[in-house]
Amino acid sequence: AEEMDALGGQINAYTTKEYTCYHTRVLDKHIDRALDVMSDMLLHPLIAQEEVQKERNVITEEIYMYDDAPEELVHDALQDAIWRDTSLGMPILGTEETIAAFDADFIRAYYERNYHQENIVLSVAGNFEEKEMLGKLNEKLGGWKRETPFVQHDTHAAYQISCVEKEKDIEQVHVCLAFPGLTREHPQKYALAIFNTLFGGGMSSRLFQKIREENGLTYSIYSYTTAFADTGVFTICASMNPNQTERVFELIAEELKEVTAEAFPEQLIAVTKEQMISNFIIGTESTLNRIGRVNGSSGLGETGYDPATNTLSYLCNITGDADSLDF
């Protein structure tokens, strides 16, 4: 951290349900030093018991904070219900019990099994020469070899119909309704994204306007999509006074019936497409977003990196007819 601070750079990491990403951002003139730091972390991690204990305490506190946020906890409860007994159903932070069971030997064994030359995606975005960058990466990581072959685990998670309730002494009720969604490579994923934006993805969406603005029944209401390699989910979430729960469910059901029976107007779809295209193009200006797109496709069993031009083409070709929005 001190070395990156001295360069005026940033270094961080995040974990999703399917992968962990370590990333850094520096001026192009500091790339050699940044690669030194990143490769040293990857090849020679400090996995000492005293460091594990420190981090265990930090993560345990994060779990306590998360448990105090029911608007967040409800999403974990939902995913546990629909993907029970699979990795997708497990919270990213873990539980107090699983964190307490880890020690340095356990983490080191995990590192040896999974941090493997056959199980890594390297992505770079910014101002660089490709041939020169490949040479630098090969210099830092080309000699990295594990003697044991990498074993890819079957991560298939079938959607399960279920219902789960968790009681807390709070003023509100937080509800999530989930429906089978689309995988990351499904050809209709962009159509679903447009549907989500129109149905519950913003303050101008049908759900927000009907239930929050017109009837004033919820504190918040929205929908979102989640896509993984072999499964997906479409989720509707709402927060409300317990007395309003039944009426909110009724209105959500009415809105679902209406959008099933009648297509969205072409003009509304056109406006939504332009909004999504603009947001996408602006997002590509971020180097972190660019490397995230590479990591999220190349490393997760997809057929390859989906260029931005393909995404824009798919969005532009979506219309309001039944075939275009058939998912």
Q: Where in this protein do the model-derived segments appear?
A:
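Catalytic cores of enzymes that engage adenine nucleotides and/or redox cofactors via long glycine-rich
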Residues: A158-Y159, K210
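Short glycine-/small-residue-rich flexible loop motifs, especially phosphate/cofactor-binding loops
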Residues: A1, F208-Q209
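Residue-level marker for well-ordered alpha-helical positions
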Residues: S205-R206, E246
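Short Ser/Thr-interspersed hydrophobic loop/turn segments at strand-loop and sheet-helix junctions
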Residues: D5, M203-S204
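Short linear Ser/Thr-Pro motifs
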Residues: S204-S205, S286
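Charge-rich, well-structured scaffold segments of protease-associated domains
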Residues: E2-H156, E165, C176, L182-T183, ...
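Flexible, small-/acidic-enriched active-site or ligand-binding loops
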Residues: S162
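A conserved active-site cap/scaffold subdomain adjacent to cofactor or substrate pockets
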Residues: I170, G181-E185, Y190-G201, L207
